[in-house]
Amino acid sequence: PKLISKIKFLAGHSLGEFSALVAADSISFEDSLNLVTQRAKFMQEAVPLGKGGIAAIIGLPLTIINDTCKKITTINNDLLVSPANLNSPNQTVISGTKKGIDLAINQLKEQGAKMAVSLPMSVPAHCSLMIEASEKFALLLENLNLKEPSIPIIQNVTAQNHYQVEEIKDNLSKHLYSPVKWLDTILLLKSQKIKTILECGPGKV
């Protein structure tokens, strides 16, 4: 209780946003399990297994990564790729079709990336390939018993804190095809004079 009373904001990276909502008493643990299960199902259905992917890019600014992805995507639909996780000034995750990811990795290495490597995930989260999945998820969210969070939630889509239930639901559906603005989230916390961040997660990512 003493720790909770000192918490000013909650945020979760990508899927972690659901953990933040549970911690804020906005949704129940049981509802969150159902949501993430259905969310994963919709996302996997949106892109055939082996056709999508993601990659981590280290050592290049977002402007170069964004421009490269845009140029690749204009070639044809099989080469769709875009920034997905905006993690830090020098670390971005890109998402899209496998062919688009492979081409982007090669081009970004040529432009000086310290590291450009595919990650072991077949679902290209946080890109436009997930729009159909987002529409299905939005229908599921309509009937969700979501409450106003007890602690402000900084959502990935906007990197702003939200209280309104309908805003939170809308952002959760957009979340599937929108980039995770994690750098902006950290900068917002800094602007609010937050000096201590408690990180909880199942792994080392």
Question: Locations of the language-model features?
Answer:
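Phosphate/ATP-binding catalytic cores across multiple sugar-kinase/actin-like superfamilies
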Residues: 1-3, 40, 176-192
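Alpha-helix C-terminal capping segments
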Residues: 2, 21-27, 192
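Glycine-rich beta-strand-to-loop/alpha-helix junction loops that act as flexible
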Residues: 15, 97, 200-202
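Gly/Ala-rich beta-loop-alpha elbow adjacent to hydrolase catalytic centers
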Residues: 8-12, 16, 20, 28
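Helix-rich "cap/lid" substructures immediately adjacent to catalytic or cofactor-binding pockets
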Residues: 1-11, 60, 94
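Conserved catalytic block of serine-dependent lipid acyl chemistry
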Residues: 114, 126, 181-205
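Alpha/beta catalytic cores of group-transfer enzymes, especially the acyltransferase/condensing modules
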Residues: 24-178
